[in-house]
Regions:
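Terminal low-complexity/charged segments
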Residues: 1-177
Length: 177
C-alpha cells in the first residue's frame, strides 16, 4: 500500500492526519480529521505525485463493542492510483452523538451511492450530498440495520408494493416473447 502517499499528504496537510499505521498485510492506513476530508481527497485526486483518481469504494464501521475510547463509527475510503499502482486507505472517525461528515460526491462522483449506502445502513449523514436518501431499504424503514445495537428481531411496518417502471420494454409491453 502507500506509505509514500501518506508522507506526501502529511507534507501538504501537516494537521490532517491524526494517525497513520500499517496493518499486518503491509497496507498503509491514514486516519483523517473530518474537517480535512474534502481538501485531502481533492489533493490526492489532483496532485500528479499522488493521482488517486479511481474511487474504489467506501464503507462504514460500527465499533460499538470495542473498548478503546475512540468514536463509535468510522467511514473508510478506498482509492487507487493507476499511475503509481498504489492503493490508499483513508478513514474518518465519527462520533455517535452527531454522526455527520462532509460529502465527497463533489470530488468523486462514485461516492454518491456509497454515501447513500452508509447513510441507509449506519445512519451517518453526509453534509452537502445532493440526494441523501435510502438506497436499499424502503423509506418507511425504521433504524439502520448494520448498527451493532439494531434489534435483530425488530418488526418493520408493512407497506404496499410499489409499481416498478419497466425501462427496457416500455409501457404496454408484456415482456413475453
Amino acid at each position: 500500500m502507500s506509505l509514500r502517499a501518506l508522507t506526501l499528504i502529511r507534507d501538504a496537510y501537516p494537521d490532517a492526519l491524526s494517525e497513520q499505521y500499517t496493518d499486518r498485510t503491509g497496507g498503509a492506513w491514514g486516519v483523517l480529521k473530518a474537517e480535512s476530508l474534502r481538501p485531502v481527497l481533492a489533493h490526492v485526486k489532483d496532485d500528479p505525485q499522488l493521482d488517486f483518481k479511481l474511487f474504489l469504494s467506501m464503507d462504514g464501521v460500527d465499533r460499538l463493542q470495542l473498548t478503546d475510547n475512540l468514536p463509535r463509527f468510522e467511514v473508510v475510503y478506498f482509492l487507487y492510483s493507476v499511475t503509481w499502482k498504489e492503493h490508499l486507505r483513508l478513514k474518518v472517525r465519527v462520533a455517535e452523538e452527531n454522526p455527520e461528515i462532509p460529502s465527497a460526491t463533489s470530488i468523486f462522483q462514485g461516492a454518491n451511492w456509497w454515501e447513500r449506502f452508509v447513510w441507509d445502513f449506519y445512519g451517518i449523514r453526509f453534509t452537502g450530498h445532493p440526494d441523501l436518501r435510502r438506497i436499499l431499504m424502503y423509506e418507511e424503514f425504521k433504524g439502520h440495520p448494520l448498527r451493532k445495537d439494531y434489534p435483530l428481531r425488530q418488526r418493520q411496518p408493512l407497506i404496499p408494493e410499489r409499481p416498478i417502471r419497466d425501462i427496457f420494454r416500455g409501457p404496454g409491453t408484456s415482456g413475453t416473447a
